[in-house]
């Protein structure tokens, strides 16, 4: 589906929280607190439950309390309730939802699969875009949108961070905060039932607030779609990824992206830069935060040796560049 209706996810004019009175409600309370702290200027719609404004839903879900349809809804509810919530939101005009964490241990594998299919069917009639289930949320600091449970303040910047690992996302945000590095977008994918990495890359490639993209992922579900988006993103701005390695369950020959070598070759061909360690990752983040767009077509090379300068100049010319002079 690519970027259709993603403007309601990344640039919503209004937000709503939908939660049930259970463990996920704590997540909902933190997200609402972050929305308030981030300074989101649009309405955050809700009704009263507990001590914080939450939509209090049970198995008989009714969302008629909304005065207007929210562009974006954040859902913190059991997976079996999510299809009904999405159907009602979609009928009212909502076009994007974030489905947050839920209690995996309470559902069998078959029940989870059934719920995922039901979510797809509920979203389809009104073209509702679904981030998740299991997404840690989305942050767009420039518009004050912090629809996540992250405890770390995130300032505006020019780097987009897209990740599948919540732990690594937290580590990156903590390090960036200590260095005064900001982000244009921070997004945790969760399980890519609808909005996947390729969709997000297509959006970020055209986003004027994003100058570089940092990606962490374990696997992709649609290889051809992903590679098309990966190439398009790298044509527009630098893309860096922390190299995924072989993990349990991903064996040689199990698919087009079954080993670290295949990942690396595919990403290098797309124009991405792969790094292998957390140390390199943090150095890359600092470099990305400080790079500036090049102006003009020429490049002047300064070297402390004739041989090194000549190698650099030859590489530049072979790549279609033009040498400048002082």
Task: Show where each model-derived region lies.
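Catalytic-core regions of core metabolic enzymes
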Residues: 1-326
């Amino acid at each position: 589906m690519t970027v259709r209706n993603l403007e309601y996810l990344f640039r919503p004019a209004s937000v709503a929280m939908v939660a049930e009175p259970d463990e996920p409600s704590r997540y909902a309370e933190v997200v609402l607190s972050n929305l308030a702290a981030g300074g989101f200027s649009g309405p955050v719609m809700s009704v009263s439950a507990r001590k914080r404004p939450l939509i209090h839903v049970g198995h008989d879900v009714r969302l008629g309390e909304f005065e207007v349809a929210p562009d974006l809804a954040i859902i913190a509810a059991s997976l079996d309730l999510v299809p009904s919530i999405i159907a009602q939101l979609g009928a009212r005009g909502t076009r994007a939802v974030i489905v947050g964490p839920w209690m995996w241990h309470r559902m069998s594998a078959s029940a989870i699969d059934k719920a995922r299919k039901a979510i797809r069917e509920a979203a389809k009639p009104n073209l509702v875009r679904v981030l998740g289930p299991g997404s840690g949320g989305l942050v767009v600091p420039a518009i004050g949108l912090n629809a996540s449970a992250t405890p770390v303040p995130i300032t505006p910047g020019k780097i987009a961070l897209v990740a599948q690992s919540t732990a690594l996302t937290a580590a990156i945000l903590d390090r960036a905060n200590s260095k005064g590095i900001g982000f244009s977008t921070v997004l945790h994918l969760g399980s890519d039932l609808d909005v996947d990495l390729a969709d997000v890359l297509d959006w970020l490639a055209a986003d004027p607030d994003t100058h570089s993209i940092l990606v962490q992922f374990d696997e992709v579900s649609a290889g051809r779609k992903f590679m098309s988006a990966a190439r398009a993103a790298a044509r527009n701005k630098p893309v860096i990824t922390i190299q995924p390695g072989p993990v349990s369950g991903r064996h040689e020959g199990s698919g087009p992206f079954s080993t670290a070598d295949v990942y690396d070759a595919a990403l290098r061909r797309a124009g991405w830069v792969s790094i292998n360690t957390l140390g390199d990752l943090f150095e890359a983040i600092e470099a990305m935060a400080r790079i500036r767009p090049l102006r003009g077509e020429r490049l002047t090379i300064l070297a402390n040796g004739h041989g090194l300068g000549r190698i650099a100049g030859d590489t530049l010319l072979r790549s279609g560049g033009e040498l400048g002079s002082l």
